[in-house]
Swiss-Prot record:
The keyword Glycoprotein does not apply. The keyword Nucleotidyltransferase does not apply. Belongs to the bacterial ribosomal protein bL33 family. It comes from the Bacteria. Pfam families: Ribosomal_L33. GO terms for molecular function: structural constituent of ribosome. It comes from Porphyromonas gingivalis (strain ATCC BAA-308 / W83). This is Large ribosomal subunit protein bL33. Transmembrane segments: none annotated. SUPFAM superfamilies: Zn-binding ribosomal proteins.
Amino acid sequence: MAKKVKGNRVQVILECTEHKESGMPGISRYITTKNRKNTTQRLELKKYNPILRRMTLHKEIK
């Protein structure tokens, strides 16, 4: 269970974009936090995808 976060810091889920296009089964997701005031746009980070075994672009999902 996620704890209730007060203030501008929110928990976001990052999902791999390249994995969806590859058609392989499974999904790569990371959970992180971001400051809503400093980062108003959706977060995009390069993270390791264990299924594809390489660094891929992960985007914030709603």
